[in-house]
A protein has these predicted regions:
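Short, conserved secondary-structure transition motifs
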Residues: 41-43, 122-126, 152-156
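Conserved beta-strand termini and adjacent loop/short-helix elements that scaffold enzyme active sites
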Residues: 36-38, 147-150
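Short, intrinsically disordered terminal tails adjacent to the first/last structured region
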Residues: 126, 301-304
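Charged catalytic carboxylate motif
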Residues: 14, 97, 191
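Glycine-rich phosphate/pyrophosphate-binding loop and the adjoining helix
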Residues: 155-231
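N-terminal beta1-alpha1-beta2 submodule of the flavodoxin-like/Rossmannoid cofactor-binding fold
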Residues: 1-83, 87, 92, 199-302
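Helix-loop-strand module that forms the ligand-binding subsite of alpha/beta enzymes
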Residues: 48-144, 148-149, 273
Length: 304
């Protein structure tokens, strides 16, 4: 008998909404769906405070696991036909709870040989995190058969303001009554059911083909802005330098304050300059950039 497992970690509830919509077609087809919510032994706060938010950076980027509560026996004892892994992105890497689960002792027993669909709901940068997820799943022989990456579609700097308001107040409302709501739009969250239908059709055939991801991309399930693709690659390298510098340092608190200042400088001063230079040179690299976008949309997906 077919059975689906949803593995997720969410703070605001947005990812749970995405996952619920994704599995709705399976539920409608009479296929049982189980949920496993990853729980930390020491929970992260939400809303965040400044110290906790920036303090999570080194361990998050370096993918250092922390203690999580054991997967319930009722989940471990069942066989699943498909796993939906819904994850947050923290600092261009999978969130610490997701990393902790994927590096836990129980994960191989639960995921080995199981096809996986990855679901994410982010501000706008998720590609590097997806690559890191794929690397961890590969070690457990769990192929990614589809990827749905929903993002905040508003302008980069507008989404910075709105996401900060959401993260530090816990309120997903219109900041200052002027800006749009933060996060993935309600319309896009609801659209996850469409991608669920696509996956369901292939699951029923028993074969997942590369055409599945192409269909998801064609229907808007993976949107990539070319400039942010380039910016994310550069940011990933710089984050690596900062994370290794801060982790284990006796001057951790001071260095985290420096990193905070660096982020402010990078987002509000350096990024607009880089953006201008990028678009000036864009015509020269159009074909290369187009290939990179297509590759990223298909990234980390393997057929069975």
């Amino acid at each position: 008998m077919e059975r689906i497992l949803v593995i997720y970690y969410t703070q605001s509830g947005q990812l749970k909404q995405i996952a619920d919509n994704f599995v709705a077609p399976f539920v409608g087809a009479g296929i049982p769906v189980d949920y496993y919510e990853i729980e930390m032994e020491t929970p992260f706060p939400f809303p965040w405070n400044n110290e906790a938010f920036f303090g999570a950076f080194p361990e998050s980027f370096l993918q250092l696991p922390q203690l999580i509560k054991s997967v319930p026996e009722s989940i471990m004892e069942r066989e699943y036909s498909l796993v939906a892994l819904a994850y947050q992105v923290w600092y261009l890497s999978p969130s610490i709870p997701i990393t902790s689960f994927l590096k836990s002792e129980q994960v191989s027993h639960l995921l080995s040989g199981k096809p996986v669909v990855t679901l994410s709901g982010t501000r706008n940068m998720w590609i590097k995190a997806q690559e890191k997820i794929a690397e961890m799943l590969k070690k457990h022989n769990a192929p990614i058969v589809a990827n749905v990456a929903l993002t905040d579609r508003h302008h980069n700097h507008i989404s910075v303001l709105t996401i900060v308001h959401w993260l530090f107040t816990g309120k997903k409302d219109r900041y200052l009554s002027i800006f749009p709501k933060a996060g993935v739009s309600e319309k896009d969250i609801a659209s996850a059911s469409l991608y669920g239908e696509m996956v369901l059709k292939q699951m029923q055939t028993g074969i997942y083909t590369p055409d599945l991801q192409k269909e998801i991309v064609a229907q808007g399930g993976v949107r990539i802005k070319p400039f942010l693709l380039s910016a994310e690659k550069k940011a990933n390298r710089l984050f690596g330098i900062w994370a290794r510098l801060i982790y284990g340092s006796p001057h951790r608190k001071f260095l985290l304050k420096c990193f905070h200042a660096y982020l402010y400088l990078a987002i509000w001063i350096l990024m607009p300059i880089v953006w201008l230079f990028y678009w000036i040179t864009y015509p020269l690299f159009y074909k290369k950039i187009s290939r990179q976008v297509v590759n990223a949309q298909q990234s980390a997906v393997s057929s069975q």
